[in-house]
Amino acid sequence: MLYETIGIVRPGNIAEVKELVLTAGKLILNQGGVIRDIKNWGTFLLPRPISTNQQRHNRGHYFVMRYDASIATHEEVRRTMKADPRVIRTANVKLGDGKLETLSRFGAIPWRSLEEA
């Protein structure tokens, strides 16, 4: 199955974001999954303040990861992200059913940065 995870990590240290993505990536690869794309969207204001782990956040560092994995692997990635105190919020979406004609509709992750506007 093709999945997409959008994660928001507490801002300030890019090494934390890299470590978190590396952990999730290793988990996917070790269980036979394939990582299709990873994008670093950078730090942005959150739509509203979010409180997690007794901290209030107004900004977050966004990243997107698109990958093929089994349902069990996807659930483990979700649990790992949810348990990590560096993560403010994640959103997970199932994009495809694993068939080639379905997967071919999804290209690169679209993003228009502020510099391009």
UniProtKB/Swiss-Prot annotation:
Q: Which GO terms describe its cellular component?
A: mitochondrial small ribosomal subunit
On whether Mitochondrion is a keyword of this UniProt record, the answer is yes
Q: Tell me where it resides.
A: Mitochondrion
Question: Which biological processes are named by the entry's GO terms?
Answer: translation
What main location does UniProt list?
mitochondrion
Single GO term (MF): structural constituent of ribosome
Q: Which UniProt keywords apply?
A: Mitochondrion, Ribonucleoprotein, Ribosomal protein
- The reply to whether Transmembrane helix figures as a keyword in the UniProt entry is no
Similarity field = Belongs to the bacterial ribosomal protein bS6 family.
- Role description: Component of the mitochondrial ribosome (mitoribosome), a dedicated translation machinery responsible for the synthesis of mitochondrial genome-encoded proteins, including at least some of the essential transmembrane subunits of the mitochondrial respiratory chain. The mitoribosomes are attached to the mitochondrial inner membrane and translation products are cotranslationally integrated into the membrane.
Subunit structure comment from the entry: Component of the mitochondrial small ribosomal subunit (mt-SSU). Mature N.crassa 74S mitochondrial ribosomes consist of a small (37S) and a large (54S) subunit. The 37S small subunit contains a 16S ribosomal RNA (16S mt-rRNA) and 32 different proteins. The 54S large subunit contains a 23S rRNA (23S mt-rRNA) and 42 different proteins.
The identity of this protein, by name, is Small ribosomal subunit protein bS6m
